[in-house]
């Protein structure tokens, strides 16, 4: 039987099947399905799988030692015990991976809201980047300010303060909105115990870490502390870092900075980090050094 004969046979079978179908029954079923589709169940919802704590989620079928497996998972956010469906990941594992990746992408390409900036009384400024694409592809522009912006910084901030705090969106706007409101009161309270006051706080859009050097030069601050969003990953999109330097200058070595990283609810909490930052700032002022010079 050649291809032409096979095609003819299939066409005949399809024609016979169509002829046996009751079209009235088909129309009735279609109307019923359409009617049901238009009805929305108000009490139904799609659960957010990103809210599941993967440290407590074991997807291996019939594990030999469930308790030991969960004990191991509790010590790491790694995706252990994800199970298999044949040779592949289970659907929930694949969906969670895509959801976490999407959250990471969103945190990079979204902006800190204007309402958040106004609510916290930040002084908004911007580096020389014009948009997110340029920020990602031109790191050098995220380190510098225009002459006009530099003048705004000089005008709005205290002159020659002991401490200048600044907030930068960095690579995660989600990290800033999730942590800043908890960490700032902790820093301010800690510094107050040492007799240090915090002046106006800058918010820098399209901020790279060395932008703090330009702020240090513009304000003449003894210590500059930058709270900035870290590059997100699949574990969390809300991790923030604090970069602190004594008398930072443009072009200074990276080794002169002290950094506290992994500030988020699953790492170092914002309140705990704030207390540590205040202590570090006091140490820098006493020893007139930062980074490896503190060692």
Swiss-Prot record:
Primary role: Catalyzes the deamination of various vicinal amino-alcohols to oxo compounds. Allows this organism to utilize ethanolamine as the sole source of nitrogen and carbon in the presence of external vitamin B12.
Cofactors demanded by this protein: adenosylcob(III)alamin
Alphabetically ordered keywords of this record: Bacterial microcompartment, Cobalamin, Cobalt, Lyase
Catalytic activity line of the entry: ethanolamine = acetaldehyde + NH4(+)
One of the GO biological process terms: amino acid metabolic process
GO molecular function: cobalamin binding; ethanolamine ammonia-lyase activity
Entry's localization field: Bacterial microcompartment
Protein name, per record: Ethanolamine ammonia-lyase small subunit
Family under the similarity heading: Belongs to the EutC family.
């Amino acid at each position: 039987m050649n291809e032409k004969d096979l095609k003819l046979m299939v066409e005949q079978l399809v024609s016979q099947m169509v002829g046996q179908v009751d079209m009235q029954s088909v129309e009735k079923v279609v109307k019923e399905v359409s009617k049901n589709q238009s009805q929305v169940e108000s009490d139904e919802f799609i659960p957010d799988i990103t809210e599941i704590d993967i440290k407590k989620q074991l997807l291996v079928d019939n594990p030999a030692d469930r308790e030991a497996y969960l004990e191991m998972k509790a010590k790491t956010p790694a995706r252990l015990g994800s199970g298999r469906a044949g040779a592949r990941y289970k659907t929930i594992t694949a969906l969670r991976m895509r959801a976490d990746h999407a959250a990471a992408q969103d945190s990079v390409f979204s902006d800190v809201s204007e309402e958040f900036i106004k609510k916290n009384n930040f002084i908004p400024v911007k580096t020389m980047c014009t948009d997110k694409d340029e920020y990602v592809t031109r790191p050098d522009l995220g380190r510098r300010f225009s002459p006009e912006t530099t003048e705004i910084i000089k005008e709005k901030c205290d002159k020659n303060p002991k401490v200048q705090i600044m907030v930068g969106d960095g690579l995660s706007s989600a990290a800033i909105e999730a942590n800043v409101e908890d960490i700032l009161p902790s820093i301010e309270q800690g510094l107050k115990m040492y007799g240090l006051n915090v002046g106006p706080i800058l918010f820098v859009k399209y901020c790279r870490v060395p932008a703090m050097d330009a702020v240090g030069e513009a304000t003449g601050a003894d210590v500059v502390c930058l709270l900035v969003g870290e590059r997100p990953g699949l574990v969390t999109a809300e991790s923030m870092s604090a970069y602190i330097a004594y008398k930072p200058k443009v072009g200074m070595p990276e080794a002169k900075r002290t950094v506290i990283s992994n500030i988020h609810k699953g790492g170092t909490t914002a309140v705990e980090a704030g207390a540590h930052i205040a202590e570090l700032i006091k140490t820098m002022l006493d020893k007139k050094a930062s980074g490896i010079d503190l060692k």
